[in-house]
């Protein structure tokens, strides 16, 4: 955990990001933005990660919606997303895009 790591948490219970009403999600991310700005200006963070996990498969361990605002100081500050993109293989992108559009 880095100095200034902050959680933005809703008072009302929602299991995860997908359950939060749109008007409240905008307020949560407005607060997260203010915290990020303060981390950079006042704590002299070099950058910031904004993170929320949805369900256990994505790493959610606390089943109450929250947003991590994580100040970053350098590459050795102990936080690592370890995201290594892989080729998408045999997915048919137009079909995947069409499937996603159905849910919007």
Residue ranges and their predicted role:
Residues 1-104:
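HIT superfamily nucleotide-processing domains
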């Amino acid at each position: 955990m880095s100095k200034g790591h902050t959680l933005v948490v809703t008072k009302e219970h929602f299991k995860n990001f997908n359950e939060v009403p749109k008007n409240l999600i905008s307020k949560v991310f407005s607060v997260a933005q203010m915290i990020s700005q303060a981390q950079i200006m006042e704590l002299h963070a070099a950058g910031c990660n904004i993170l929320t996990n949805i369900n256990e498969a994505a790493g959610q361990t606390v089943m109450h919606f929250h947003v991590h605002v994580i100040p970053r100081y350098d590459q050795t500050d102990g936080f690592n997303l370890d995201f290594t993109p892989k080729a998408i293989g045999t997915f048919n992108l137009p079909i995947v895009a069409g499937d996603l559009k159905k849910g919007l």
